[in-house]
Amino acid sequence: MLFPLSLSSPLTPSAVKIERENLKQFELENFSRYSIFELVENRSDFYDALLIQLWQEMGLSEQLGISLIAVGGYGRREMFPLSDLDFLILVEQTPIPEIEEKITQFIQFLWDCGFEVGHSVRTLQQCESEGKQDITIATNLLEARFLIGNRPHFDALNELVKRADFWSKEGFFNAKVQEQIERYQRYHNTAYNLEPDIKYSPGGLRDLHLLYWVALHHSGAQTLEDILQSGFIYPQEYQQLQESRAFLFKVRFALHLILTRYDNRLLFDRQIKVSELLGFRGEGNQAVEKMMKCFFQALHRISLISNLLIQHYRENVLSSNQATVIEQLDDDFQLINQCLCLRNSLVFQEKPARILDLFFYLTQYEQANIHSDTLRQLQISLEQLPQKLCEIPEAREKFLRLFNQPNSIKRAFMPMHQYGVLTAYLPQWQAIEGLMQFDLFHIYTVDEHTLRVMLKLESFLSQESAQEHPIAHRIFSQLSDRTLLYIAALFHDIAKGRGGDHAELGAKDVANFARLHGLDRREIDTLAWLVQSHLLMSITAQRRDIHDPEVVMNFAEAVQNQVRLDYLTCLTVADICATNGNLWNSWKRSLFASLYEFTEQQFAQGMKELLDYSEKSAENRKLAQQILTQDYSDIMPISIDQLWERCPEDYFVRNTPKQIAWHTSLLVDLVEALLVKISNRFSLGGTEVFIYCQDQPHLFNKVVSTIGAKKFSIHDAQIITTQDGYVFDSFIITELNGELVEFDRRRELEQALTLALQSEKLSALSITPNRQLQHFTVQTDVRFLHENKKEHTEMELVALDKAGLLAQVSQIFSELNLNLLNAKITTVGEKAEDFFILTNQFGQALDSQQREILRNVLYRNIG
């Protein structure tokens, strides 16, 4: 025992607390000196000694019919600094009041010492009846460990839990696997969550426990070593599990050392501290990213091997009496009861290219899976490969063939990634496996994200995607060959983590891949351009003024043709959706659709002239007039004309006919000088906040502060000033989750905005700090675009997306007498990437001195 208990009798809670602190200090000082298994078992031994001494002091050892038994993680001797003390007090019969009082005092003492205690008092008969009804109780009893008391009584409990009528092998197995299925669903079937749970995430410690429980129930194997000795796992599987288990134990132990309350989630602030304790080093976030890469790789190995062994148990133990249906596929493969099997265990060693045929057959037989024996042969073969699979000409042909098979991403490429075949095929893949970026934007590792992009592309073929992604669905469904898009998706982030521009490096990688695989010059150029430019459409749509003809022209010139536009649109939408499920919403859908349509029009018109928006303005006026005639027939045409004469042409370009008609219906007979209306009916993809009032100081500041205080996301701001000094302000907002705003919330915001605009004072902004943002730093960057423009100035601001940022920026605009014409508000995880169109107080573009003043004030106040 590394840290023996050294407390004299009688024990006191204060003395125990001091001894626990001494133990924790010992563990902190010796964390890197001892193996993690020694530290974990030492804790268990410490608790054993404490509980046995306390049991004896309470006089419970003098009672013949009562025993103290460790269960759960304590029963397994897996005790971490904040683990619960789980134990069973096994009694021969219901305790008499005197014994019951001693048991109560025993448990109360542990509570007084600050322990989290999970306890039960049961007879053998109660253990049987309750264990039969509850798989959790049955599992706890299965891993029971005797501490002190009546040993024969404990042995009787052990015999009970082994009986087939307590839990049959099949019943126990199915119940535990169902628990795993439900647990995986809670974590979206991926281990690669932003702030993962060491215990419950897929591939976490619970997956190891499942393997342990099944083996324990089946054969009584107590440890991984016992399972190895039984022949149930191979030596290399044992080695990988043991290494991964040791790493997760280290992370969990370190986490518990830095916390004061039990938790197994690796939150951002904890990742930093744990990485330091584990000895990871590097500049900036490198230490955390290195640790998390090791962490996710450990989860992946545990998930892969434990699920493979669970499948092996199902196929070779539970299904051993099942009737066999065999279908011969070719000389090397056969289908046995819908499981793909090798006809010769040496196939993959002798003919490595045939590894890819295994996944080809998965695409051809929708209900089939891969037999566990074949998966094990696959793992052995991958470890022994003398070269990358892509170096084998036959393998290259088979790899390309996969892209054109039905459900190829779901049925072939996802499993290929899961089982390590992509690593064996692509030289660059291993570098991105488990690579997590320490930010709030990318919620998956780079490899997981890449496969999700490919899977999202494949989903565009489904009819369900027609409503959510109408343009991508139409384009992707009509493509005769989708191979190029899938390859572009495979490579779009493959160079991350190397340093340098990942898009530029990835473009070189994909060009080399394409040449190696025999693609022609046009295909090579298209692939390289797609990877190099995969962020172009996203930046243009979300951070530029797409109603500016020059922006559309510049984008069209970069894209060059309709084919590339189609490819880029599909890749961009898939990339956004696969980065973070909360990023895509109806507002973004309308934004990208508009850019796509404008660019289509530019290609159709030709590249010699800018798009003529005067036609767009006239068309929108005409359509708005038709809507007004149909839906608002009581409005006099002369009133409409008088109102529209006050509006600049820009107003009719930037608003849809429905919006124009709605605004007109509200304003044409308006008497008041202030109007705030909010609706979901007229703006594509968001809730529109429409404000009409006389221009006033700090107007934008008041509006954004109020909207922010009510916890809405602002996506777009448009300020139109009439010739007589009134403003038509339109803000596109959503709830924080991207949903449209419901009626009660709209009415509440209308009232709040009206009060704010009637007040001469600026209300103080109530800011609730974001827990996650506290652990990130974003370097503030102010960039002025197209500085030769004379009519306005375009500015891009990158900063930490802290609460009140937009209100702070608008306050600075007010203080410098700057007019805001338009704004695009984009949040990328913890980073705000906002775009503003400004003029000075004379309605002109800012000169160099004014730009420099603005830049310095922003840096001084924001970053």
From Swiss-Prot:
One of its GO terms (biological process) is regulation of nitrogen utilization. Its cofactor is Mg(2+). PROSITE patterns: ACT, HD. Gene3D superfamilies: Hypothetical protein af1432. The keyword Repeat applies. It catalyses: [protein-PII]-L-tyrosine + UTP = [protein-PII]-uridylyl-L-tyrosine + diphosphate; [protein-PII]-uridylyl-L-tyrosine + H2O = [protein-PII]-L-tyrosine + UMP + H(+). Residues 329-687 are annotated as: Uridylyl-removing. One of its GO terms (molecular function) is [protein-PII] uridylyltransferase activity. Pfam families: ACT, GlnD_UR_UTase, HD. Belongs to the GlnD family. PANTHER family: BIFUNCTIONAL URIDYLYLTRANSFERASE/URIDYLYL-REMOVING ENZYME, BIFUNCTIONAL URIDYLYLTRANSFERASE_URIDYLYL-REMOVING ENZYME. Modifies, by uridylylation and deuridylylation, the PII regulatory proteins (GlnB and homologs), in response to the nitrogen status of the cell that GlnD senses through the glutamine level. Under low glutamine levels, catalyzes the conversion of the PII proteins and UTP to PII-UMP and PPi, while under higher glutamine levels, GlnD hydrolyzes PII-UMP to PII and UMP (deuridylylation). Thus, controls uridylylation state and activity of the PII proteins, and plays an important role in the regulation of nitrogen assimilation and metabolism. This is Bifunctional uridylyltransferase/uridylyl-removing enzyme. The gene is glnD.
